[in-house]
Structures are given as structure tokens and as C-alpha cells.
């Protein structure tokens, strides 16, 4: 049976797997579904429609699945979908989507969302992402796998944060961050690539060296984006990692941080 503290309030339409734990004074509203092994701490508010997968842990004072504050929202049915093995620390806020976009906010698997971080409506978070304390994502933000946003990072709506990228503390991001790139400052500027993160994740030295050359092509040779992308076509055919970097620039809709 579910391990539900008697002081918690659970809507009768909520669906909880047998092994779900719910702490005291938490509120789980209608339309919430929680998978096996998930632990909901005390003083958590979950609103639906929200689907939460397996083996997640949600800490006290978090608000997950709340209505978006977007002024265009008029009570339409929208969703939040959370995958498996995520850690959502104290005071995190995650809003559902809007019908003007996908009507869904999505959080993948194995993410760490640290205290007081915010994930805005219609955002899409991949896997193995870390949002450090007080990081705030506006609506419609996409964060790809293995990105790390340090504390107090602010991300403008509709920005795309590339895979394996990194932001320094207090960075204000107003354009897209290409895959692997490290950004710092307010406004954000590209400083280097996340080479330490690549090594920790087992990237080969050949791939890292190829990415280093690709970074210099885009950021250090005074080329236009079109010229740089043309020069990267050959190394992208040799190294999948360079292809990921190249694609993250090609698909940018807001322009990249340079």
C-alpha cells in the first residue's frame, strides 16, 4: 500500500503507485499520477494534470504542476510530465504548459533541480540536467541533456540551452547556448567549452580536440556564422560530437551567444 502520512491531503482521483511515500501536510490534487518508488516530502503541493514517473524525490515546500502565470492562460487543460529518477529539492516551482505552445512542460530522467529553482511553462528539460539553486527558466525554454546551469542563472523565454553546456553563477542568458559551450556574465558571453565535463563523461581526447578546434572556428577566427558552419562541415562528418555542436548552431532561432 502507499505510505501516506495521515496528515497529507490526497484527492480521490489522484493515482499513486503502491510504493509511493507522501509526507505530512502535503497536498496532491486531482489529475496527479505518481509512479512507484517516488517520495513526496512534507509541505509539497502537486497539482494536475501532472504525471510523475518512478523513483523521484520531491522535497519540502516545492510547488509542482501549478497553473502558469502567463496572462494568456485562461484555465485550459495543460500538463506537466516528469520522468524517472529526478531529485527536486526544497522550494522548487514547476508550472504546467500553455495551449499557445505544446500545452505541456516536460522534465526527463535523472535530473537534479536544486533549491528554489524555477521551471517555467512549456519548458522542456532533457536528462541528467542540473539546475543549481535559484536558477530560473522563463517559459518555453529547452535545456538539452547534461547541461549544468549554476546558481542564480537566468534564462530568457524561448532560449535553447545545448547539451553538455555550462553557465557560471549569476549568468543572464538571452540567446541560445550552443552545445558544449561555457557561458558567463550578465549579459552572457561565451568563454570556452565545458572540457572538464566532457572528460568526466568519458569523451575521447580526439573528440575533445576536435571540439576545441570547432570552438575556435566559430568564436576566434572572426568568421560569420555562415562561414564558420561551412568550415565545420568536414569535421562534423568525422566526429559526431562536432555534428552536435554544429546542429545546435544551425537550429538556433534566437541567435547564439558569441
From Swiss-Prot:
It catalyses: a (3R)-hydroxyacyl-[ACP] + UDP-N-acetyl-alpha-D-glucosamine = a UDP-3-O-[(3R)-3-hydroxyacyl]-N-acetyl-alpha-D-glucosamine + holo-[ACP]. InterPro entries: Acetyltransf_C, Acetyltransf_C_sf, Hexapep, Hexapep_transf_CS, Lipid_A_LpxA, Trimer_LpxA-like_sf. Gene3D superfamilies: Hexapeptide repeat proteins, Udp N-acetylglucosamine O-acyltransferase, C-terminal domain. It holds the Pfam family Hexapep. It is found in: Cytoplasm. One of its GO terms (cellular component) is membrane. Pathway: Glycolipid biosynthesis; lipid IV(A) biosynthesis; lipid IV(A) from (3R)-3-hydroxytetradecanoyl-[acyl-carrier-protein] and UDP-N-acetyl-alpha-D-glucosamine: step 1/6. Disulfide bonds: none annotated. Keywords: Acyltransferase, Cytoplasm, Lipid A biosynthesis, Lipid biosynthesis, Lipid metabolism, Repeat, Transferase. Its EC number is 2.3.1.129. GO terms for molecular function: acyl-[acyl-carrier-protein]-UDP-N-acetylglucosamine O-acyltransferase activity. It is an enzyme of class 2 (transferase). GO terms for biological process: lipid A biosynthetic process. Belongs to the transferase hexapeptide repeat family. LpxA subfamily. Homotrimer. Involved in the biosynthesis of lipid A, a phosphorylated glycolipid that anchors the lipopolysaccharide to the outer membrane of the cell. This is Acyl-[acyl-carrier-protein]--UDP-N-acetylglucosamine O-acyltransferase. It comes from Pseudomonas syringae pv. tomato (strain ATCC BAA-871 / DC3000).
Amino acid at each position: 500500500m502507499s505510505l501516506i502520512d495521515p496528515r497529507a491531503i490526497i484527492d480521490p482521483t489522484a493515482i499513486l503507485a503502491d510504493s509511493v511515500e507522501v509526507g505530512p501536510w502535503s497536498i496532491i490534487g486531482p489529475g496527479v499520477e505518481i509512479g512507484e518508488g517516488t517520495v513526496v516530502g512534507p509541505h509539497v503541493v502537486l497539482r494536475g494534470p501532472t504525471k510523475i514517473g518512478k523513483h523521484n524525490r520531491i522535497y519540502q515546500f516545492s510547488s509542482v504542476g501549478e497553473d502558469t502565470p502567463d496572462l494568456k492562460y485562461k484555465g485550459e487543460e495543460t500538463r506537466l510530465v516528469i520522468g524517472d529518477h529526478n531529485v527536486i529539492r526544497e522550494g522548487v516551482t514547476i508550472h504546467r504548459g500553455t495551449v499557445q505552445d505544446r500545452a505541456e512542460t516536460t522534465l526527463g530522467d535523472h535530473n537534479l533541480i536544486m533549491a528554489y529553482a524555477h521551471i517555467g511553462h512549456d519548458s522542456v528539460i532533457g536528462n541528467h540536467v542540473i539546475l543549481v539553486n535559484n536558477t530560473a527558466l522563463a517559459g518555453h525554454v529547452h535545456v538539452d541533456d547534461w547541461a549544468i546551469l549554476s546558481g542564480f542563472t537566468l534564462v530568457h523565454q524561448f532560449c535553447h540551452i545545448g547539451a553538455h553546456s555550462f553557465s557560471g553563477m549569476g549568468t543572464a542568458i538571452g540567446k541560445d547556448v550552443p552545445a558544449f559551450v561555457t557561458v558567463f556574465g550578465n549579459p552572457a558571453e561565451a568563454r570556452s567549452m565545458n572540457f572538464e565535463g566532457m572528460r568526466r563523461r568519458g569523451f575521447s581526447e580526439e573528440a575533445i580536440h576536435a571540439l576545441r578546434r570547432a570552438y575556435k572556428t566559430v568564436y576566434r577566427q572572426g568568421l560569420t556564422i555562415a562561414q564558420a558552419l561551412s568550415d565545420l562541415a568536414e569535421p562534423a562528418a568525422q566526429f559526431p560530437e562536432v555534428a552536435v555542436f554544429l546542429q545546435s548552431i544551425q537550429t538556433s532561432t534566437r541567435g547564439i551567444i558569441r
